[in-house]
Amino acid sequence: MTLAFGDWIVHRRWYAGRSRELVSAEPAVVTPLRDDLDHILLDVTYTDGTVERYQLVVRWADSPVAGFGEAATIGTALGPQGERIAYDALFDPDAARHLLRLVDASATVADLRFTREPGATLPLYAPPKVSSAEQSNTSVIFGKDAMLKVFRRVTPGINPDIELNRVLAQAGNRHVARLLGSFETSWAGPGTDRCALGMVTAFAANSAEGWDMATASAREMFADVVGSDFADESYRLGNAVASVHATLAEALGTSTEPFPVDTVLARLQSAARSAPELAGRAAAVEERYRRLDGRAITVQRVHGDLHLGQVLRTPDDWLLIDFEGEPGQPLDERRRPDSPLRDVAGVLRSFEYAAYQKLVELAPEQDADGRLADRARNWVDRNSAAFCAGYAAVAGDDPRRDGDVLAAYELDKAVYEAAYEARFRPSWLPIPMRSIDRILG
């Protein structure tokens, strides 16, 4: 196959290798799905010797096909039948429906295994459309009923998004979109580690992202608009998160472990190299962590990367989505049990971002008297308290009761955010730095 995958993949939003220099992008496994459709596992090699594997579904055509934009056009390749054009098949409605039919049939194609969940009904005739919201994966929405998420960068092991959604669906938890199906392969041929490739879930039609709702409330609060309070929704969100935690604990169990002091210290040291602003606070943060050395905490399976962008408000309730865990971590690490307080801390940090992101866009003289900063702080405090109260109403235990542990998880998250902002969005660095100072007191 002479297709220049490397020239195309580096411009995709889901490509994770931008910080490294690409050497080659070559197909490792090619599985024909039909005459004009190939499933491809692409190995991308970098100058540092590392290799990442990406998943593509390629639609072949002898001449240009209307409807495919530049982003969906991979290139041309010379084969036995002459020159052909390759397209990203997820943008082709007929090809997307073919994938859904394979899931519906629980089909096996070579080493590709498709599975429909028991009792699931898939909308085989609904019109498909690629979602514009994804970053690391590609999702195709079928009408108002289902969403096919295709993982782009794939790794061996059990995928936590499929795993936890299956557990929650089987338990009947109403705070997740029901898992309808999935597909996988073997990493290095039959008998080797499994490798998740994608999943189908019920689509949350007419839903709103929690981040959009919270930031809209915060903007209205700054403008003195009546009705800007978000606390009732924060309370219900706390209910939902506690419900998911309770289901996971009951289904998969809990255990007791020491607070992960070494893990958070390693993250602090790494972050300090990216954000010099942390240097003057590193000793105080470390001291906070070391206070918890040897402290026993209850751990279980959790979401692992929870924030307001990972929750959807439907007309009926809150849903938690994307149980993949912390981006960039190996699958085994993402599946490691952790304290439910990590998820709680993620939501609390997200409240701070929702309130303060407007402030960082203002010139200092626009809030010279600190009035807007006070409003932001009050908004965060009110919504954080409502969320924790809602969580406690379902869990029977207020997460603020273990305040020093919760604060440590908030610090860990803020330290990570500081490193990220210093590298990619320096104008937002004051948000996590302000939080670190507040937590340290």
Curated annotation (Swiss-Prot):
<comment type="function">
    <text>Catalyzes the ATP-dependent phosphorylation of maltose to maltose 1-phosphate. Is involved in a branched alpha-glucan biosynthetic pathway from trehalose, together with TreS, GlgE and GlgB.</text>
</comment>
<comment type="similarity">
    <text>Belongs to the aminoglycoside phosphotransferase family.</text>
</comment>
<keyword id="KW-0320">Glycogen biosynthesis</keyword>
<keyword id="KW-0119">Carbohydrate metabolism</keyword>
<dbReference type="GO" id="GO:0046835">
    <property type="term" value="P:carbohydrate phosphorylation"/>
</dbReference>
<protein>
    <recommendedName>
        <fullName>Maltokinase</fullName>
        <ecNumber>2.7.1.175</ecNumber>
    </recommendedName>
</protein>
<dbReference type="GO" id="GO:0005524">
    <property type="term" value="F:ATP binding"/>
</dbReference>
<keyword id="KW-0321">Glycogen metabolism</keyword>
<dbReference type="GO" id="GO:0005978">
    <property type="term" value="P:glycogen biosynthetic process"/>
</dbReference>
<dbReference type="Pfam" id="PF18085">
    <property type="entry name" value="Mak_N_cap"/>
</dbReference>
<dbReference type="GO" id="GO:0005992">
    <property type="term" value="P:trehalose biosynthetic process"/>
</dbReference>
<keyword id="KW-0808">Transferase</keyword>
<dbReference type="InterPro" id="IPR011009">
    <property type="entry name" value="Kinase-like_dom_sf"/>
</dbReference>
<keyword id="KW-0547">Nucleotide-binding</keyword>
<comment type="subunit">
    <text>Monomer.</text>
</comment>
<dbReference type="GO" id="GO:0016301">
    <property type="term" value="F:kinase activity"/>
</dbReference>
<keyword id="KW-0067">ATP-binding</keyword>
<keyword id="KW-0418">Kinase</keyword>
<dbReference type="InterPro" id="IPR040999">
    <property type="entry name" value="Mak_N_cap"/>
</dbReference>
<comment type="pathway">
    <text>Glycan biosynthesis; glycogen biosynthesis.</text>
</comment>
